[in-house]
Every structure is written in C-alpha cells, then in structure tokens.
C-alpha cells in the first residue's frame, strides 16, 4: 500500500469510530475540524474531573501545537453550545494524539509501519482478540502483525483485517519517539516553508 496523498489524508474516513453520545458529538464537531484543516482522531466522554469531553485531533500533516489545541477549542465550543448534546456541565479538553497514538485510519498503519503496536478485534482472529507486535505490511484490506511473543503453536505473523478492529494504538519505544519527533519536525518545516511561499506570492500580487 503506497503512501497516501495530502488530499486523500484530509478526506480519509476513520476505521474506528464512536457510538452513542460520543458519536453524536463527533458528528457535530468533525465538519468544523475539517474546515480548519484538522482531522478528528477520537472523541471520548469521561468522568475525570467531574465530566470531561476529550477531543483528540491533529492537522492533516500529523502535527499539533498548543496553539492549535486552543484554536480548536475556541471553534468547537460555540457549536457544542448551540447543538447542546450534553445535558450536564462539562470540561472541554482538546489534545494531540500523542506519540503512542490511537490508530484509527489506514494511513496511520502505513505511516507507522515497522513500529510496535497493540490492538483488539471485535471477532476472533487466529484464535484470539488481543494482539501485540510490529506492523510488517499494510494493504487495502488490513495489515500483518509480527507478534513479539507468540504462544506455542502460533504463527509469528498474523493478518488482521481492518473491518475486525475495535481498538488499536502504538506502543511507546525509543525508536517510535525518535521517528515521531523527526516526522513532526519535518512536517512543521514543510508547513513553514509553504506559508512563506504563500506570503511571497501575496507580496508579488
């Protein structure tokens, strides 16, 4: 599976989505995020600090700054106030996915191929529902995971279809930290260069 283009990433649907109230909130805020150039990663209501609405999002290039979090919070707050999906007082928390991020789109698996992850499936796959290992390949239908500790009699590599996924996230390792920081630096440099180019274009006009 080849690396997706910027346009494909911006419009790529999530493999793992919410249910119930979380789903309703996601449906309300996602159009706002898309218009701002962000992608929704996850919505979750929790009882932490009273009632907390956690919105996890990122730019289409995978970056996210503190200022971005503030901008998203300011943009979605009035929309949520109008739609009013939550009938109690709550605290809004906007964050990046983090380095040990949830994997919710096919492009996440392509981007982090070679790294360690853990996942759960909604159906039995090769006799189990929980897996931990390294992503060795990705195609349109799913990915192949090299188990880090296969049980006796288990194949070292298992094929997991995307349609079976119920939860997936990266596992924090030194290699992941190194590659994630390098990717973030590269993406921010590219965005800065593009913004400078657009500024020069406006000056010429």
UniProtKB/Swiss-Prot annotation:
It is found in: Cytoplasm. Pfam families: DUF150_C, RimP_N. GO terms for cellular component: cytosol. GO terms for biological process: ribosomal small subunit assembly; translation. Signal peptide: none annotated. Its main location: cytoplasm. Keywords: Cytoplasm, Ribosome biogenesis. InterPro entries: Ribosome_maturation_RimP (IPR003728), RimP_C (IPR028998), RimP_C_sf (IPR036847), RimP_N (IPR028989), RimP_N_sf (IPR035956). Disulfide bonds: none annotated. It comes from the Bacteria. Belongs to the RimP family. Required for maturation of 30S ribosomal subunits. HAMAP family: RimP. This is Ribosome maturation factor RimP. It comes from Sinorhizobium fredii (strain NBRC 101917 / NGR234).
């Amino acid at each position: 599976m080849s690396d997706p283009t910027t346009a494909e990433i911006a419009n790529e649907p999530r493999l793992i989505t919410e249910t119930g109230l979380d789903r309703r909130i996601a449906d309300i805020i996602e159009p706002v995020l898309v218009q701002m150039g962000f992608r929704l990663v996850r919505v979750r209501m929790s009882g932490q600090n009273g009632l907390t609405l956690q919105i996890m999002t990122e730019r289409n290039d995978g970056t996210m700054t503190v200022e971005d979090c503030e901008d998203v919070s300011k943009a979605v707050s009035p929309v949520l106030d109008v739609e009013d999906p939550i009938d109690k007082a709550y605290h809004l928390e906007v964050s990046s996915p983090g380095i040990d991020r949830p994997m919710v789109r096919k492009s996440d698996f392509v981007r982090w191929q070679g790294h360690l992850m853990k996942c759960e499936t909604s159906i039995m796959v090769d006799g189990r529902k929980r897996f931990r290992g390294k992503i060795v390949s990705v195609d349109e239908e799913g990915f192949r995971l090299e188990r880090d500790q296969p049980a006796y009699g288990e194949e070292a590599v298992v094929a997991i279809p995307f349609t079976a996924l119920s939860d997936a996230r990266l596992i924090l390792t030194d290699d992941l930290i190194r590659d994630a920081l390098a990717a973030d630096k590269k993406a921010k440099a590219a965005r800065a260069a593009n913004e400078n180019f657009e500024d020069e274009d406006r000056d010429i006009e």
